[in-house]
Amino acid sequence: MKKKQASHVKLLLVITLIIFAAVTAFVVMNTEEKATTNKVMKELPSIGNQPTLGKEDAQVSVIEFGDYKCPACKAWGEQIFPQLQKDYIDTGKVKFSYVNVLFHGTESKLSALAAESVFKQDPQAYWIFHKEIFKAQPENHDAPWITSEKLLEIAKTYTPNINITKLEEDLNKQTEQEEVNRDEKLTQDYGVEKTPSIVVNGTMLSDPYDYEEIKNLIEKALKEKK
């Protein structure tokens, strides 16, 4: 009887050790996979005068490469950005910049031109306009919806300080084309292949929705700055 009990104990011990080893291996492999799939850049192209939220001298920089036509970017702005803003931007630890990506053609370009025009008029109003464009994105996002009329309507409704006549003129003349060209060059320089792409102090995340990984990269950067 005692031998049987001893055998059961040994069996349970072996099973426990196997499970522990498997879990440990999974955690290690998962950590290594994140480390290898995140893209680390040794030389960071300057983002110049991009729309930026937060303290200018914040220790950590987070950049979003996004497209107003992109549903995944809308979701990131609704699900992840509010956490980032509360935890790090509003506390002065992170400055957040946005770069337009034109992966969806004419509508992407038109919305980028409008956003750049609003930014030039009023950097604070820009962020309201930016948010409202994404909110206006319909469920059927693939159907054409970004038009000059729609963008002017958003500006009139949510950014009353913006000169609508000037915005309309800028859209008709593509006044901010040079700024949009700069965004396209940044997209190329950073090797952006999807939207949204999130870069934390030179590390582009493989999964932009992994807020824990975003936090890990920020906390690591903050410690390195001390």
Task: Name every feature range the model reports, one short phrase each.
Residues 22-27, 49, 60-61, 106-110, ...:
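Extracytoplasmic/periplasmic mature domains of Sec-exported, cell-envelope-associated bacterial proteins
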Residues 62, 70, 198:
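Conserved S/T- and glycine-rich ATP-binding loop of Class I adenylate-forming
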Residues 1-31, 65, 81, 154-226:
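C-terminal cap of thioredoxin/glutaredoxin-like
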Residues 30-64, 86:
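N-terminal, intrinsically disordered, polar/charged segments of Gram-positive cell-envelope systems
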Residues 42-45, 51, 74, 101, ...:
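Flexible, active-site-adjacent loop/turn segments at secondary-structure boundaries
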Residues 66-69, 74-156, 190-193:
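Structural alpha/beta surface segment adjacent to cysteine/selenocysteine redox centers
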Residues 58-61, 92, 194-196:
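Envelope-exposed proteins and targeting segments
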